[in-house]
């Protein structure tokens, strides 16, 4: 038999019954009822209802004390922030509702001088901004809050904020700032207690930066594996899945896709295999293993959110796609001295414009010795020996011209 749904009226009635003389058991019962109603609203995806709840029980916050009230508010807010709003207009509306809920709670905490609560809610807002890809606002708020936390020496919250600042900086293409923020987080984990969640977050971001800037995929894989274990140990399936996704990415970049079957068969990983994120990255890995550009492009198109909009993957998938395209072009062109652009595109399975751009880039990068005939829409490939001797012949021509000029000059001197 299902439990009777809790109503706002029942919660308000219970809150009104509490006084300074209420026993611990009575206060705890009221607190449990509030959280039960909050979870119920989260299941119903009612963020507006959760905001109403937060505002309607504020008399209870004064009754239970600052520390307990802060935890209660943060728990209720977290219920709202974990609501999946779907896609399209509903998603955009949900983002706004979540931001409004947090800013409303931050405003209340500020006006009531609940500074610890205000800072922790601001840290959560930074994470929300990153989650909804509003990296500019995330970075701005993170910079301001970091300065305050450094003065207060609130190391645990500083670690959280620094990791989020590093994430926003990375997504805004500021790797120097991303590294600096991550270094701050790492320094503070050495001198303060970091929860398993925080330590896993630091490991995850370390893996991201090592893969993006250093191209050190072995070290990145180790960091992502540590992050996976950390998130999995506390039941954080969302972040654990992301860490596993990036582990697979590292195997692709290391050209070790043949090891994926063994990795994914591991006891602690099997439960994550059916996640859309893992299915997406595996489709990319399969295409790369088969060296099929067509399948690779198809994977990117079918899993755009996971493989293109995720910058951690996109940084590498774009390079992989470019390299695979150039190899395909070289393979098709190799037997010919002149070949139509339309034929190359047809064999590769792409349209002409991206193929033409890729060939132009290859010529500029000296990966292909040839030229594009714009009138005939063909690619003229120079013979390899001829291409190798072009520079030598050019120097010889210049030397001959120099001799001619010198002779002409010396002859004119005799006429004077």
Swiss-Prot record:
One Pfam family in the UniProt entry: RPN6_N
Keyword annotations from UniProtKB, A to Z: Proteasome
GO cellular component annotations of the record: proteasome regulatory particle, lid subcomplex
Gene Ontology molecular function terms on file: structural molecule activity
InterPro entries for the chain: 26S_Proteasome/COP9_Components (IPR050871), PCI_dom (IPR000717), Rpn6_N (IPR040773), WH_DNA-bd_sf (IPR036390)
Recorded superkingdom: Eukaryota
Annotated PCI domain residues: 217-386
GO BP: any one term: ubiquitin-dependent protein catabolic process
Known function: Component of the lid subcomplex of the 26S proteasome, a multiprotein complex involved in the ATP-dependent degradation of ubiquitinated proteins. In the complex, rpn-6.2 is required for proteasome assembly.
PANTHER family: 26S PROTEASOME NON-ATPASE REGULATORY SUBUNIT 11/COP9 SIGNALOSOME COMPLEX SUBUNIT 2 (PTHR10678)
Subunit structure: Component of the lid subcomplex of the 19S proteasome regulatory particle complex (also named PA700 complex). The 26S proteasome consists of a 20S proteasome core and two 19S regulatory subunits.
Family, per entry: Belongs to the proteasome subunit S9 family.
Name by which UniProt lists this protein: Probable 26S proteasome regulatory subunit rpn-6.2
């Amino acid at each position: 038999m299902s439990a009777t749904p809790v109503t706002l009226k029942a919660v308000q009635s219970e809150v009104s019954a509490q006084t300074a003389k209420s026993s611990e058991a009575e206060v705890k019962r009221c607190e449990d009822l509030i959280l039960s109603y909050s979870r119920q609203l989260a299941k119903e995806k009612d963020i507006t209802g959760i905001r109403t709840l937060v505002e309607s029980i504020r008399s209870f916050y004064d009754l239970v004390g600052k520390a307990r009230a802060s935890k209660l508010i943060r728990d209720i807010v977290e219920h709202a922030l974990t609501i999946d709003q779907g896609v399209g207009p509903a998603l955009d509306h949900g983002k706004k509702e979540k931001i409004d809920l947090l800013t409303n709670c931050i405003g209340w905490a500020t006006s009531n001088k609940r500074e610890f609560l205000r800072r922790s809610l601001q840290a959560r807002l930074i994470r929300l901004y990153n989650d909804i890809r509003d990296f500019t606002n995330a970075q701005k708020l993170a910079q301001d809050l970091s300065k305050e936390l450094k003065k207060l020496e609130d190391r645990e919250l500083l670690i959280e904020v620094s990791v989020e600042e590093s994430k926003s900086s990375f997504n805004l293409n500021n790797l120097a700032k991303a590294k600096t923020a991550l270094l701050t987080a790492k320094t503070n984990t050495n001198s303060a207690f970091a929860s398993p969640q925080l330590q896993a977050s630091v490991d995850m971001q370390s893996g991201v930066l090592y893969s993006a800037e250093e191209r050190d995929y072995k070290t990145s894989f180790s960091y992502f594996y540590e992050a996976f274990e950390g998130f999995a140990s506390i039941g954080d399936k969302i972040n654990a899945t992301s860490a596993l996704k990036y582990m697979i990415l590292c195997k692709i970049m290391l050209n070790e896709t043949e090891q994926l079957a063994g990795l994914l068969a591991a006891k602690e990983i099997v439960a994550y295999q059916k996640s859309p994120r893992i299915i997406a990255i595996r489709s990319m890995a399969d295409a790369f293993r088969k060296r099929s550009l067509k399948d690779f492009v198809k994977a990117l198109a079918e899993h755009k959110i996971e493989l293109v909009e995720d910058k951690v993957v996109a940084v590498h998938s774009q390079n992989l796609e470019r390299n695979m395209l150039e190899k395909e072009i070289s393979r098709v062109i190799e037997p010919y001295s002149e070949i139509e652009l339309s034929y190359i595109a047809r064999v590769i399975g792409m349209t002409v414009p991206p193929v033409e751009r890729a060939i132009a880039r290859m010529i500029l990068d000296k990966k292909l010795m040839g030229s594009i005939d714009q009138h005939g829409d063909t690619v003229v490939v120079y013979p390899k020996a001829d291409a190798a001797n072009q520079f030598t012949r050019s120097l010889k021509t210049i030397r001959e011209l120099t001799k001619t000029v010198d002779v002409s000059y010396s002859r004119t001197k005799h006429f004077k």
